[in-house]
From Swiss-Prot:
Protein's name according to its UniProt entry: UPF0114 protein KPK_0696
Family, per entry: Belongs to the UPF0114 family.
Lineage of source species: Bacteria, Pseudomonadati, Pseudomonadota, Gammaproteobacteria, Enterobacterales
Transmembrane segments: 15-35, 53-73, 109-126, 136-156
Compartments, as annotated in UniProt: Cell membrane
Stored InterPro entries: UPF0114 (IPR005134), UPF0114_bac (IPR020761)
Taxonomic source organism: Klebsiella pneumoniae (strain 342)
Membrane topology, as annotated: Multi-pass membrane protein
Primary subcellular site in the record, as a coarse category: membrane
Keyword Membrane: yes
Keywords annotated in UniProt: Cell membrane, Membrane, Transmembrane, Transmembrane helix
Gene Ontology CC terms: plasma membrane
PANTHER family assigned: UPF0114 PROTEIN YQHA (PTHR38596:SF1)
Length: 164
């Protein structure tokens, strides 16, 4: 009975495979939105203000960071929790594949969230005249919460490594 339960639990990790594949569909959707934004701004490139262009570019950078985060979570999560990726020898391989454990993935995700939040906050500040003060305050508080959380997670991981 014990062996059956252990085998069933171990095999159930494959339930995550479609979830990671679903993230790749999210990446497709993000790519479509990215190019939709470019197609939207290009016809107006000579009439758009500098600040509007910068806001659009920040949106593109934001989407790029989210896309990188999706790729990182997809591949690292799959390798850590489902199965090792079998990539042919002749094919290009990402240098970090197989080297990122759950802790380093967590730290990279936290750092990515801080970067994404920073860009979002910069976009908000560039349009600050149209944003109520209390909303600006909450954006800053939320961003600082992300920064503090990432810092604390990194610090705790360092403490944990020193103890082991």
């Amino acid at each position: 009975m014990e062996r059956f339960l252990e085998n069933a639990m171990y095999t159930s990790r494959w339930l995550l495979a479609p979830v990671y594949f679903g993230l790749s569909l999210g990446l497709v959707a993000l790519t479509i939105k990215f190019f939709q934004e470019i197609v939207h701004v290009l016809p107006h490139i000579f009439s758009v203000s500098e600040s509007e262009l910068i806001l659009t570019l920040l949106s593109l950078v934001d989407m790029t960071l989210v896309g990188g985060l999706l790729v990182m979570v997809m591949f690292s999560g799959y390798e850590n929790f489902v199965s090792q990726l079998d990539i042919n020898e002749g094919k290009e391989k990402l240098s970090w594949l197989g080297k990122m454990d759950a802790t380093s993935l967590k730290n990279k995700v936290a750092a990515s969230i801080v970067a994404i939040s920073s860009i979002h906050l910069l976009r908000v500040f560039m349009d600050a005249k149209n944003v109520p003060d209390n909303k600006l305050m909450w954006y800053v508080i939320i961003h600082l919460t992300f920064v503090l959380s990432a810092f604390v997670m990194g610090y705790l991981d360092r403490l944990n490594k020193v103890k082991h």
